[in-house]
Regions:
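Class I S-adenosyl-L-methionine-dependent methyltransferase catalytic core
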Residues: 1-152
Length: 152
């Protein structure tokens, strides 16, 4: 199964490429530095996985003495993205892009925002409760179709 991965920041794709090489799986992964709002579907069908920034980080073990797993202060990622868009605007644009560029695909999004499906204007087909360290999240599944799933 081919794996396509990407990030808007070269630093992150370079980091992922080096980790994939160390793990011996680099040949199975196609990495691109690209904006998620610009990337076209690399195959007819597939699965998208997204763990977007949501303004909270989990401190790595030992970073503050015995504070392993505590939340770090929120970052600006909660309020805005690199192009200045708010999180709400970004997710609305992302959902529109996915419907146009990825019909027939499945998307999974990990988020602590329980209202994310409404912000994206997508109906989730699954909502799986999860914890990302101390952060309560949901893993949302969206079955992507071109246009709208609403009955006329």
């Amino acid at each position: 199964v081919p794996i396509f991965a990407g990030d808007v920041a070269f630093r992150m794709t370079d980091f992922a490429a080096r980790n994939a090489a160390r793990a011996g799986v680099a040949a199975a992964i196609e990495l691109k530095t690209v904006d998620a709002l610009q990337r076209s579907a690399p195959a007819e069908r597939g699965t998208l996985m997204l763990n977007p920034p949501y303004g909270e980080r989990i401190d790595p073990k030992g970073s503050r003495g015995d504070g392993a797993g505590r939340r770090a202060p929120p970052t600006a990622a909660r309020e805005s993205f690199e192009d200045g868009a708010s999180a709400h605007e970004f997710f609305t644009r992302l959902a529109t892009h996915w419907k146009r560029a990825y019909p027939g695909w499945t998307a999974w999004v990990l988020s602590p925002d329980m209202k994310l499906p409404q912000a994206m204007r997508l109906k989730e087909s699954r909502r799986v409760p999860m914890w990302n360290g101390p952060i309560e999240c949901r893993l949302f599944r969206f079955d992507l179709v071109a246009g709208s799933m609403r009955e006329p």
